[in-house]
Amino acid sequence: MTASHIDYTIRYAVDPAAAARMDTDALRANFHIGDLFRQGRISLTYSHYDRMIVGGAMPVDKPLALETIRPTGTARFLERRELIAVNIGGPGRIEMNGESFRLEPRDMAYAGMGEDVTFSSEDPAVPAKFYLLSAPAHQALPRRHIRIGDAKRLDLGSAATSNERSIFQFIHPEGVKTCQLVVGMTQLAPGSVWNTMPCHVHDRRMEAYLYFDLDDSARVLHLMGEPSETRHIVMAREEAVLSPPWSIHSGCGTANYAFIWAMAGDNIDYTDVEMVPMETLR
């Protein structure tokens, strides 16, 4: 039985031909994830793309335990999984098997297979918002806390191409070890609005984006689909989107923003992508 403070939905895999025939409502029903952060609750979306779970936990006046859900088929949530939690709210804490870590805004924690996890906020008036990413694991790896200042930083793009940005790699082959999760954050500079353009696909990994750090009235037009058959989904702040392995994943905002990207699949090689020539986009 699912705990009373946890809600979950299931998203099945969609092939590119079916996605090309979808209208706006169908695209959003299959790929868009909203309502992630609700006070006192954990909201989870179980995706059949590489069995990735995308979710949000927003503890307020009491801790929230990450308990199992039916789709995992296990007695404990992380019995055969690993987890990454990124805090995009006020200061909070994550407890893993009795060890507590304080997460400032934009800090990350990794929980390996077999851990029991609980989330809490330091100040109920400014609650933490933990963005959750979980994928199947084959071995237990050490729990870790990575501060945003300790992440591997790359400054790329330019104002001339409207894509000046800083990339923060939380998980990478030279850093924290995971079974298959790869997670990072990109912050666009003021005046820059484009992400991941020129675009690419990676058939061996799915990806999920969480857009945040933008005003309530701002939007990001997230581009998806096969390069020759693109579609868009309009994204508001603190909303996520699933990207199948066959799909591009790019976006353009009405103002600058930040987003958290996460991948799972056959490998953790950032360079294992197929670039899409601009002239083939339609």
Curated annotation (Swiss-Prot):
InterPro entries: KduI, KduI/IolB_isomerase, KduI_N, RmlC-like_jellyroll, RmlC_Cupin_sf. Its cofactor is Zn(2+). It catalyses: 5-dehydro-4-deoxy-D-glucuronate = 3-deoxy-D-glycero-2,5-hexodiulosonate. Gene3D superfamilies: Jelly Rolls, pectin degrading enzyme 5-keto 4- deoxyuronate isomerase, domain 1. Keywords: Isomerase, Metal-binding, Plasmid, Zinc. Its EC number is 5.3.1.17. Pathway: Glycan metabolism; pectin degradation; 2-dehydro-3-deoxy-D-gluconate from pectin: step 4/5. Zn(2+) binds at H200, H202, E207, H249. GO terms for biological process: D-galacturonate catabolic process; D-glucuronate catabolic process; pectin catabolic process. Binds 1 zinc ion per subunit. GO terms for molecular function: 4-deoxy-L-threo-5-hexosulose-uronate ketol-isomerase activity; zinc ion binding. HAMAP family: KduI. Belongs to the KduI family. Catalyzes the isomerization of 5-dehydro-4-deoxy-D-glucuronate to 3-deoxy-D-glycero-2,5-hexodiulosonate. This is 4-deoxy-L-threo-5-hexosulose-uronate ketol-isomerase 2.
